Amino acid sequence: FFLQDRDGEHHSPGQLYDRVSEIFVLPGLKGSSQRESMFSLFLSCLNDIPDPLLCDVARIVTRYFASRGNEVLTHLQITPNRQFLYLKAFFILKHDIQGRNPQTLRRVWITRLCEECPSLLVPQLDAYGYEYFDLEHVCSEASTHHVYDALFWALDRRGLTTLAMDQLDKLAMDLAQHTHQVLDDGVDDRADSEAESSREGVCKRFKKLHLALTMAFRLCVENSLSSSASVEFVHELWFRVLYTLVRLEHAFYDSSRIHAPKDSLLALALSHSQTFTQEALATLVTSVPSETISFAELFKRLVHGISQANIMY
């Protein structure tokens, strides 16, 4: 009754844990062997425990059934959202700095974060540091679920920052190509539900790109201020980001649609790409010492690169 919240108390978070703790101090249940005998009953009740009380379940497992944690995790895997709610209690920001959570738990947590709450992934990575989680697993899951800011973070911590820039360029160019395909389908000339869905899809992809760019800017700044990064490497990172953005912006200067209305998808795409470029330049100018990177050399290289590029969509 207590576990299934059927005794009329309608537990709020914390109360279920308190009531179970009261049971386990009763005569005959104080010993670990006696409590262990109740584990199968506890496990059989998990599916009926309300979602808001799953953090209490995590506390109960940690205190009374610590050796059976994997069984609980396995039992909950058929309901990924509930498994995510259960795991939240183990990964309060900066709570497990000593590394008590086993790697199995950490790996499942990364997967569930990518699926259920991708915006929390980078804060988790920042809080625990690059040695806490399996970064190869982070890269795999973040790539699968298109959580690009976390993917770039993990690649950088693995010493693969240039690969992150490759991913950024591909993401931007794929977006440009997709946007042109939608435009060629006449989305700006129609007002039906399919056209609206296509517009929304493009807007979502721009939002994903913005998140990825924000992380790319951050990585550029961090490497610019790092004593271990060479000037040549820092220059290359900034060039890669700016070159990608200039190419993206140029992709939407379409002379055949030069007079497109301001609310058209083309105008929106161009506005977004211009804003991204402005953000990159503002970050570069305000965050990187002028002696660290030659702006004149960087912009000269950009102009040359763009003049040599053959951009096809």
Label the predicted regions.
Residues 1-139, 148-156, 161-313:
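Extended non-globular scaffold/tether segments
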